[in-house]
Curated annotation (Swiss-Prot):
Root EC class: transferase
Pathway annotation from the record: Cofactor biosynthesis; thiamine diphosphate biosynthesis; 4-methyl-5-(2-phosphoethyl)-thiazole from 5-(2-hydroxyethyl)-4-methylthiazole: step 1/1
Binding site for ATP: 113, 159
Name by which UniProt lists this protein: Hydroxyethylthiazole kinase
Cofactor or coenzyme needed: Mg(2+)
InterPro entries named among the record's database cross-references: Hyethyz_kinase, Ribokinase-like
Organism encoding this protein: Exiguobacterium sibiricum (strain DSM 17290 / CCUG 55495 / CIP 109462 / JCM 13490 / 255-15)
Catalyzed chemical reaction(s): 5-(2-hydroxyethyl)-4-methylthiazole + ATP = 4-methyl-5-(2-phosphooxyethyl)-thiazole + ADP + H(+)
Coiled-coil zones: none
Record keywords: ATP-binding, Kinase, Magnesium, Metal-binding, Nucleotide-binding, Thiamine biosynthesis, Transferase
E.C. no: 2.7.1.50
Family membership: Belongs to the Thz kinase family.
Amino acid sequence: MLRRIHDKKPLIHHLTNTVTINDCANMTLALGGSPVMAEDLLEVEEMVGLADAVVINTGTINPDMRKAQLLAGKTANRLGKPVILDPVGAGATTLRTDFMKQLMEEITFTVIKGNASEIKTLLGQAARTKGVDVAEGESLDLQSVHAFASQTKQVIVVTGPVDFVTDGVRQHHLDVGTKRLGQVTGTGCMTASLIATFLGAGYGRFDAAVFGTYAMGKAGETAGNRPGIGSFRTGLFDAVSLMTEESLPEVQMNGQ
């Protein structure tokens, strides 16, 4: 059990996609947080005011969701609440690319987490996508990510075979996880929920990004010997729910 999180039980407001919303809620609970998924424009500002952190996930956007996400992000900025962007599908269509530009122009994010294709799109670089998934063979210059984080004062997480986290000053590589994480939809979305839960419990933004990303990778390794995809997915929740404080110094001591 992660005592700091369980003691506070941070409220994490998700404006997320309909494909993985239940998994994001359960992963937040597994780590010790409390999820809420309020999308109505009439209550978004009030809910952000109650929340300890906000997640904006663009997986299944529509006109109302786009308005709600913009309002939630701006409200979080005004109130000084951490806000995480998971730019799912960035670069896949003109609509998504244009909306990402609007989000980046109008909201300052605490942490941005995405795969190589999504982050390249946010950096204004040409990217190849396959729906909401990263295209095979897609590569990204990590120094450009580091520079972007420094310029925007936002923590950037690039997920992949080796995850990369930078705040523009520090950078951290996480060689943890399993290919099986790519066989279950929503593991990236759940990673954003984990990062938000650490943020909501008062961890620093760089540490929260590293710890949340590490937690998903480590859970994948722990559940990796389960025979089927269904039991593997369940094992992810089990592994996160059983994590303790002792696992976190291991992340802190890794080379940066």
